[in-house]
Amino acid sequence: MQLNVNGTAQALPDALADPALPLLWALRDLLGLTGTKFGCGVAACGACTVHVDGSAVRSCVTPLEAVRGKRVVTIEALGSPERPHPLQQAWLEQQVPQCGYCQSGMLMAAAALLAKNANPSDADIDAAITNICRCGTYPRIRDAIRTAAAALQQSTTKPTSPAPAHPKAIGGQS
């Protein structure tokens, strides 16, 4: 089976690429992309959020078969230490990270929101960010999304699903 992950065609060994295998485990165990986290396994927490064709999906319940022929983007492609995505920069400015476990999923959900809505209201943010943060940084997350939205509006670049980047960007591999 072949997947398009972070702009690169990735061949998965047929013996390991069960079509029912959750995308999360293919990313982490077969491709070594460990920025996407396992939290609950039932699509409730959002730690495993990635983009599939530009939409935020919970990879823990998304079978490989469902992403065949589609574009998968993980946190590793959101930005780089040299050139962080405006969301990553805003996350730091607003001091969002505490334990950090949910951050990659939160960032990916926020990136999907801003790609579709450049100026989200608090209600839009609350509706789009259904991820769970056990540290309770929701007000900071909302502030960071508003900060990033403003930064993106000031730049000439519109938010899209991220392009491939350095794997150790904020919220990336650990």
Residue ranges, per PLM feature:
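Signature of N-terminal electron-transfer/Fe-S-associated modules in redox systems
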Residues: 1-174
